[in-house]
């Protein structure tokens, strides 16, 4: 509990990552989804739709590739974005978007693009770097870790509960944040999303 109150990140093995902060975000002390757990994706295309059942790892990797195609995101910025992608997806595995219709999440919610993975080998490397690290709210819930593109060269609002992809890239590039964890604290600490 002390770790969570001080905003420390831990791996699934309990190892500390990052440093203490005054913020109250995010920590993993629960069973995390297995790479082979299933994501039921409502895939909209050409006016039609179908439900695809995908492995969790394959899904989040394809979303990372689809959300951030530029190499400027490689490294710490993409790692922060990957943490948001994983937490957001996990939230909808626990609270499906439409369980009655048989799906957890939709292509209108996340940019699922498996064909883009091969464009940049850093997509896989950056996801593997945060493979066993997760976020929880201050109260231990898996929260809806919202994220959007945001504007170039702007960090956006801190404690908003919504990570800006371009904001992460900007803060890392100018040295405002040195690690993905600092980006995550910037957006999620003491926000409505992470306090619940």
Protein language model annotation of sequence segments:
Residues 1-196:
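Conserved, single-site charged/polar hotspot
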């Amino acid at each position: 509990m002390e770790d969570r109150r001080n905003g420390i990140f831990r791996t699934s093995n309990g190892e500390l990552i990052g440093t203490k902060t005054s913020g109250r975000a995010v920590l993993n002390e629960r069973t995390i989804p297995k790479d082979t757990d299933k994501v039921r994706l409502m895939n909209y295309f050409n006016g039609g739709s179908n439900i695809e059942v995908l492995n969790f790892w394959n899904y989040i990797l394809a979303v990372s590739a689809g959300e951030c195609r530029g190499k400027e995101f490689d490294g710490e910025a993409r790692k922060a974005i990957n943490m948001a992608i994983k937490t957001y997806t996990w939230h909808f595995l626990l609270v499906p978007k439409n369980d009655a219709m048989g799906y957890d999440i939709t292509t209108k919610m996340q940019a699922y693009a498996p064909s883009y993975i091969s464009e940049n080998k850093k997509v896989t490397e950056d996801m593997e770097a945060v493979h066993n690290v997760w976020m929880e709210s201050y109260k231990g819930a898996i929260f809806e870790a919202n994220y959007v593109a945001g504007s170039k060269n702007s960090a956006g609002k801190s404690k908003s509960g919504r990570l800006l992809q371009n904001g992460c890239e900007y803060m890392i590039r100018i040295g405002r944040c040195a690690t993905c964890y600092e980006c995550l604290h910037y957006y999620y600490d003491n926000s409505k999303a992470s306090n619940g």
